[in-house]
Amino acid sequence: MKAILLGLSLFPLAVLAGEKIDKQIEVANGGTIYIENQRGDINIRGWDKSEFKVSGELDDKADGYELKTSGDKTQFIVNMPRNTDWGNSGDGSKLTIFMPKSSTLEFAGVNVSVTAKELQNSAEIDVVNGEISASNLAGNIKLTSVNGDVKAQNLSGNIAFETVNGEINDKNSSGKLRFSAVNGDIKSNSTASDVRLENVNGDIDFTLSSIKNLRINTVNGEAEVHIKELLKGADVRFESVSGDGEFYFAADVSAKFEIEAHANGKIINKVTSDKVSKAKYGPSSSLKFSINGGNANVEMNTISGRLELHTK
């Protein structure tokens, strides 16, 4: 009965601006934790307890908060006045939150930076202006910042990164990776076998271990891609507009290569002695060859860019 009462509890909504908070309630393991905080710095961490705990100081413009749980859903919202100025005036919330490792995290905010660690059952973090730092997360993971960097380490599962004006730095990820960025560089060191990227106005620096599927589409950016191993049947595709691509493959790479360059693009082949063919008409060139049995496929296409193939 006590657990049921706790499950339906709703903490008082009215608190003084900037007031300290220290609350803890029982929640369902494997449920969903929804957190909404519009401004400040939020530190979220998974633990082994079937409890949700929040401590720290609320935004000095906050109009109370809600903390409630029902069934497998828990909600913590820092309420803000409707006419809130989302600028930098005043202090945002400074909160540390603990939640079950087995629960799913959903976070939304505006001018807020978020750190999330040690969660095993998926996480979605969406902010407008702020940095996201994530480590040791697993499951379906989506990290989105419109104006801010995203830093990640030791993520596993189905992982998606999105930024508009910010950099993405991914270390030691595994599973499937998706990147979408505008006006920001992307760096990844990953064992993911399935990687896809779309970006505009940003450089790419990839170090990939074992690739089955790789798709890169870039506009106005430089790409440097190191692939330690192409798995049998692997499919690699690269397209660029006004952007260069340097690809480094293993010395014993087995693949069929089909490379095209248009509008004065250039192809440099340092994998084999095969020569680039110039088009009879127009400023285009192409290169086709197979090496070591051709167990994978590599297709590249550039408009006004430079493509370089290397082994190491």
Where do the model's predicted regions map?
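Intrinsically disordered, low-complexity terminal regions
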Residues: 1-312
